[in-house]
Amino acid sequence: MGSQKSPYFDANSVFYIGLLYICIYETLAVSWPTNGQQTSWNNRPSYNQYYQYQRAYPGLYNRPTTAPNAYSKNSAAITTRTTYPYYRSSTYNRYPQQQQQQRWGMPRFPAFLPPLRNYQQVNRLEPFLPPPSGDRNIPLTPGVMRMLGISPHGHMMNRMGMNQPYGPDRTVGGITVDGSDVSYA
């Protein structure tokens, strides 16, 4: 891990120790307590929904629970403060932590990329879905299009299945073969 000069704290060892620390931290502090999924700012129910839920079940959020107050003047006196049972209520944490719905951990995706598990299943079943309602035609799938000599991105193919770089086919998938930006040719 270390080099000859300083066996402990050269750049290599610092890097690897940092890597170890990150791995351990991710495992213990992130993936364990929340089961790999943290409450996300983007998908949280609107507060309208919380309010509707309260109106439907008045016993739930209204019923105050009592807890000892740490900030009372007389430390011997047990004063009580109101806590709401299904919230984590705190002055500094405005939004309640909600119950994690997802059982199994998943890697943390970047915010702009949704987890692909849902879509993947639907895409697997795509050839078996019926055509859109009102349409009695058998839909043209990419495989059939290739058999007919049509490439699925909309340009003709020759018999070997290659896009011809001349004539109407100078464009492959919207990008011109010779490198110019004329994508509609």
UniProtKB/Swiss-Prot annotation:
Localization in the cell: Secreted
GO cellular component terms listed in the entry, alphabetical order: extracellular region
Keywords noted in UniProt: Secreted
Tissue spec: Component of the acid-insoluble and acid-soluble organic matrix of calcified layers of the shell (at protein level).
Protein name (database record): Uncharacterized shell protein 8
Organism: Lottia gigantea (Giant owl limpet)
